[in-house]
Amino acid sequence: MKGSLIIVSFLILGTLCGFYHLIPYDFTDSKLSYYALCGLMFCVGISIGNDPNTLKSFRSLNPRLMFLPVMTILGTLAGCAVAGIFMSQRTSSDCMAVGAGFGYYSLSSIFITEYKGPELGTIALLSNIMREIIALLGAPFLVKYFGKLAPISVGGATTMDTTLPIITRCSGKEFVIISIFHGFVVDFSVPFLVTFLCSISF
């Protein structure tokens, strides 16, 4: 939660700097966002490489539960595609690109800003932060009315880090491994799906 608020604070600060012309306009035309993206991808790779225990724990998973991240991805993209039908100013592929962030707001918003512009990038940032917040605050409700796998699916890419504690508390310790596996797979899919969906239009 704290990390999400910090990200939003920087967004607001940047908006104010741009609105009052405190930063030269040429600054936004630089390749700074591209280099930031490269740095972020490097950090993602380090985090995966530094945690071999996570990869080993996947072997003990129930084979049927391995389909959960696939269902999360398909369900999210299907819902975004339907939402795009009712949005006259946005294509379904735009909406799907935003949804393909799966709560990974830092990476997806940079990708989308780079490919589609700052407006859609901002929408991606806010919508993916909201997904994380909903998973954090709504986990008890989701478990009560939709089952113990519900907060894992809603958490998207965040279930192996920020939302893991609340999922463990609400769903039980037996769901820790599937939560980590789910977050790992969905997290890994983000750069590929976002890039692909930004490159097409329908």
Locate each region found by the language model.
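Hydrophobic transmembrane alpha-helices of multi-pass small-molecule transporters
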Residues: 38, 135-136, 163, 191
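Transmembrane alpha-helices that form the ion-translocation and gating core
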Residues: 66-112, 130-146
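Juxtamembrane helix-boundary/capping and inter-helix hinge elements in multi-pass membrane proteins
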Residues: 1, 22, 48-55, 61-65, ...
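Entry/N-cap segments of selected transmembrane alpha helices
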Residues: 52-80, 121-133, 178-186
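Juxtamembrane boundary at the C-terminal end of a transmembrane helix
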Residues: 192-202
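Helical membrane-embedded segments and adjacent short helical loop/helix-boundary regions
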Residues: 1-76, 92-103
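Alpha-helical membrane segments and immediately flanking helix-loop junctions
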Residues: 93-133, 148-181
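Small-residue-rich transmembrane alpha-helices that serve as helix-helix interface/gating elements
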Residues: 37-39, 183-190
